[in-house]
Amino acid sequence: RDVAPSRGLGDVYKRQPQARLTVMDLVKGACAERIYPVGRLDRNTTGVLLLTNDGDLASKLTHPKYLKKKIYHVYLDKNLTKADMDQIAAGIQLEDGEIHADAISYSDEVKRDQVGIEIHSGKNRIVRRIFESLGYKVVKLDRVFFAGLTKKGLRRGEWRYLTEQEVNFLRMGSFE
């Protein structure tokens, strides 16, 4: 069984902040099988996340050799300079190795504190670490695309079952 929730902190966490609800609470009762997240989003990141009970599919979507695309909308504490954007595109040296953005662009050419970044890496907190290494604070981070899946039509905290066609495309590796 494959489920795609639109992960959000918002109302779910505000209702009972001491409970520290997780994405698994959002999909409780979605299916009889045990499902688990494919990849990860840290507690302060919102966006599309896939849950499945198919270990082979999870491996295909998370192993670096399969190069599955992730696109994030990044909100920064200040405008990103063109020089820093070029440096991110060329590659940034982090403590666990060099990371390259596959693509990066301003979300708005006038207000340059929001960018879209495409990466294939699944390293922990990689997008936040890229910007922090250059002196930026990530104010908000939203994953808008993962392996061909988007959160289109889903509000924060909502989820849906994948269509049979989506599952087949994922299994065949047809999505980036």
Locations of regions flagged by a protein language model:
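Short, charged/polar surface micro-motifs in flexible loops or helix N-caps
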Residues: D11, R20, A32, N44, ...
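Short glycine-/polar-rich loops that comprise or flank the Walker A/P-loop
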Residues: L9, T45-G47, K68-Y72
